[in-house]
A protein has these predicted regions:
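Extended, subdomain-level signal for the structured scaffold at the beginning of enzyme domains
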Residues: 1-110, 119-121, 187-188, 197-317
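Short loop/edge segments at beta-strand edges and connector loops
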Residues: 46, 152-154
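Flexible, glycine/proline-enriched loop segments at strand-loop-helix junctions
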Residues: 84-89, 127-129, 162-165, 177
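Structural detector of well-ordered beta-strand residues that form the stable sheet scaffold
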Residues: 110-111, 132, 151
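Short, small-residue alpha-helix embedded
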Residues: 118-120, 177-178
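Short beta-strand and adjoining strand-loop segment in the mid-core
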Residues: 120-133
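An amphipathic alpha-helical interaction segment
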Residues: 135-138, 144, 149, 156-209
Length: 317
């Protein structure tokens, strides 16, 4: 399998290097399994003969125009831009966009993580497809690319020839998925050597206040929830207190966060419950009561459904 990894000016250093390291590890271990795949042919490519990363390191690249044959997979690691406006500006009208479209139309599989997902979305290849991105970029991604079926709670989304991964160190999951799609056994071995565990969801790492802060109504909603965590809550009553209609609140949470008002309430409660579990000696029942659940089984069920772990595991991780 031929894999081209894009190195661009301003690339996120660890994202680029971890993709290369996972693939190199796969190559070094492939003889350790029965019927291992052929070696991965990895090419670092770009728009010129060198690229300067976000930390100023110079990386030699094979220009896309000089590639002798098409890769099977084209990987776009993240850029080091740290705010949504800078990311959007960096990607808008970038010369890589035309290449992405051309490669995809030629049958090449595309993979991207974190801010790199903005390249795929900006090129249009993600329209009508499910995808993920870094959790803190969800609101900006949703606003700019409404035709993409974004689920930013997921760490990895594979849809045909399109693979997207979440926040910065989801580059590991992205690279490992490329290995696993060709050889599950080799992928498992690589994950063991590199001590990579399954991380199906990035929701546990999201900061509700940061996500809501992109919209004044949602910022007020988030503050109101935290001020009344232990109290019974009706969305219609909260909307009235915020001076908006329930429908307006529903539209805002859907457009910015991709969830319902009740889902957001549950996320804020889970965020506080996680904090209490990890920083206090309160019993599980006391924590449940502190975040508005009279029955601890309700909190247990919510943790299992949304974080995919047990309450005890949440406390110790």
């Amino acid at each position: 399998m031929r894999i081209a990894v894009a190195a661009l000016d301003g690339s996120f250093d660890s994202g680029l290097s971890v993709v290369l390291d996972v693939l190199a590890t796969a190559n070094s271990l492939r003889d350790d399994i029965t019927g291992g795949p052929p070696p991965y042919e990895v090419v670092i490519t770009g728009l010129a003969t060198t690229a300067r990363t976000g930390h100023g390191l110079s990386v030699e690249t094979v220009p896309l125009t000089a590639m002798e044959r098409l890769p099977d997979v084209f990987v776009v690691p993240a850029l080091a831009a740290k705010t949504p406006p800078r990311i959007v500006e960096a990607v808008r009208n970038h010369p890589l966009l035309e290449w992405i479209h051309t490669l995809y139309d030629s049958g090449v599989a595309l993979a991207a993580a974190c801010t790199g997902t903005f390249f795929l979305a900006e090129s249009g290849v993600l329209d009508g497809h499910p995808a993920t991105t870094s959790w803190w970029l969800g609101p900006a991604f949703r606003n700019r690319f409404p035709a993409v079926g974004l689920d930013d709670s997921r760490t990895l989304v594979i849809d045909g020839r399109l693979t997207t991964a979440g926040a910065a160190f989801a580059h590991i999951d992205l690279a490992l998925s490329i290995v696993r799609q060709q050889s599950p056994a080799l992928g498992d071995l690589v994950s063991r050597y590199l001590v990579i565990g399954d991380r199906p969801s990035q929701a546990a790492f999201a900061v509700p206040a940061l996500l809501a802060g992109t919209d004044p109504t949602l910022a007020a909603f988030e503050r109101w929830i935290r001020d009344h965590l232990a109290e019974p809550l009706l969305i219609s009553e909260v909307a009235t207190k915020l001076g908006v209609s329930e429908r307006t609140l529903q539209r805002s949470t859907a457009a910015v966060l991709g969830m319902s008002p009740l889902d957001f309430v549950q996320e804020v409660r889970l965020d506080q419950a996680t904090f209490l579990l990890r920083t206090t000696d309160l019993t599980a029942s006391a924590v449940a009561a502190a975040v508005g659940y009279q029955n601890v089984s309700t909190l247990r069920s919510l943790v299992r459904r949304r974080r995919r772990v047990t309450l005890n595991a949440l406390r110790t991780t």
